[in-house]
């Protein structure tokens, strides 16, 4: 079953998407870990992957979730976020996780994603947007 699913995904998915996924998560992810190991040997610490909580708001009220929906909305503005991502890319990172709250409540999320086509973004979402 898993082999059929993998075969179907490889054959029916747009080849550009498969290539970009393999490049960003495969080679660039491996390279990011190798650079991280080299930094550790030099006594420097900078994580191989960066997870960023870009907003504290959410449209749901899930039991057990840490997001305080009664709290005033706070978000990272676009320019500081670009600087953070660019600095991480200079350190060899190409994999970023965007979390929140609900990341798609950040009005400029697509601007952020479009500005960094050389990076892979994993967006942690509740799926309602």
Where are the regions a protein language model picked out?
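Conserved alpha-helical substructure of the radical SAM core
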Residues: 7-129
């Amino acid at each position: 079953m898993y082999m059929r699913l993998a075969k179907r995904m490889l054959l029916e998915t747009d080849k550009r998407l498969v290539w970009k996924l393999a490049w960003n998560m495969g080679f660039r992810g491996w390279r990011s870990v190798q650079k991280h190991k080299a930094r550790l040997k030099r006594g420097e610490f900078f994580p191989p992957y960066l997870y960023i909580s870009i907003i504290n708001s959410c449209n749901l009220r899930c039991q057990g979730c840490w997001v305080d929906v009664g709290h005033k909305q706070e978000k990272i503005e676009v320019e500081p976020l670009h600087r953070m991502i660019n600095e991480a890319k200079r350190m060899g990172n190409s994999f970023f996780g965007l979390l929140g709250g609900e990341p798609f409540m950040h009005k400029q999320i697509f601007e952020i994603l479009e500005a960094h086509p050389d990076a892979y973004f994993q967006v942690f979402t509740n799926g309602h947007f």
